[in-house]
Design a protein with these regions (language model features):
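Conserved non-catalytic scaffold segment of RNase H-like nuclease domains
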Residues: 1-118, 133-155
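Short alpha-helix plus adjacent loop in nuclease-associated cores
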Residues: 121-135
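Acidic, divalent-metal-coordinating active-site segment for phosphoryl/phosphodiester hydrolysis
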Residues: 156-165
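Active-site phosphate/pyrophosphate-handling residues
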Residues: 101, 125, 162
Length: 165
């Protein structure tokens, strides 16, 4: 895909031991760095978090404590990731609310102050939520497979209640 970029773009995703930015750790970082010339560089790292991976995370990701035991920790990868990401913009799904803050926290934890304020952040989830309707009619169509107006009068409390039921 040809993108019109002013700066390289890093499309990335993280897998973590949980959702807490302070207590949890990254166990996988995967990225595609797209250059302004359209070149692509891919990276994928399994990371030893230094803490136990909860069973539910192991089941969800397939990344187990056994898998990470001989992998590098984040500190071992941090400087090379910092160098790779320097001068780039970032994109992901739910990245503005989770992945960017988690990555920033991991960098700070190992003494690297990566300045995300100079980067554009493109969150595909935000775009999706703006492009797709997020109302009762959209939910009704998604869950019931029918248009709400075929079954109910919208914007009538009694009808909206029935549709929700």
């Amino acid at each position: 895909m040809k993108l019109n970029l002013k700066k390289p773009l890093v499309i990335f995703d993280l897998e973590t031991t949980g959702l807490d930015l302070v207590r949890d750790r990254i166990i996988q970082i995967s990225y595609i760095k797209v250059g302004i010339d359209g070149s692509e560089k891919r990276g994928d790292h399994i990371i030893n978090p230094g803490i136990m991976i909860p069973k539910e995370v192991e089941e969800l990701t397939g990344i187990t404590n056994e898998v990470v035991k001989d992998k590098p920790n984040f500190k071992m990868l941090a400087q090379s990731l910092c160098n790779e990401f320097e001068g780039c913009d970032f994109a992901g799904f739910n990245s503005n609310r989770f992945d960017i803050p988690m990555l920033a926290e991991e960098f700070l934890r190992v003494g690297i102050n990566f300045d995300f304020s100079k980067c554009r952040m493109i969150d595909a989830q935000v775009i999706f939520h703006k492009m797709e309707k997020r109302n009762l009619a959209a939910a009704y169509k998604f869950y019931c497979g029918r248009k709400m107006e075929e079954d109910f009068e919208a914007h009538r409390a009694d009808q909206d209640t029935e549709a929700t039921y």
